[in-house]
Amino acid sequence: MPQNRKLGRDSAHRNLMLRNLVTSLFKSGRIQTTEPKAKETRRAAEKMITLAKRGDLHARRQALAYMTEETVVTNLFEEIAPKYQDRNGGYTRIMKLGPRQGDAAEVCILELV
């Protein structure tokens, strides 16, 4: 059974952080974050796109329960999901940028393909 990375936070903080990162990804199309956060965000974002590809009311309500903005859910179901209708997974890409200046954390860009 796959486990989540802890990311140095308790479970409530981690879950809300991932929800916010997924919402930001669908709002802007790309986000810049650290590599472990990007890998966890990718897992959640790909699940949301697969859910949106179903397109039924139950899937929409599940997405609304996960994401923090209703307009982003509408965008996901009406614009993003139809674009990936014929693709089975692999909706996102991680591009590494190298270490961050302040703390040398590996930074990368997570974007929709």
UniProtKB/Swiss-Prot annotation:
Pfam families: Ribosomal_L17
Superkingdom: Bacteria
GO cellular component, one term: cytosolic large ribosomal subunit
GO MF term list: structural constituent of ribosome
GO BP annotations, alphabetical order: translation
Keyword Ribosomal protein in annotation: yes
Keyword line: Ribonucleoprotein, Ribosomal protein
Subunit structure: Part of the 50S ribosomal subunit. Contacts protein L32.
HAMAP family according to UniProt: Ribosomal_bL17 (MF_01368)
Record family assignment: Belongs to the bacterial ribosomal protein bL17 family.
Protein name, UniProt field: Large ribosomal subunit protein bL17
Origin species: Alkaliphilus metalliredigens (strain QYMF)
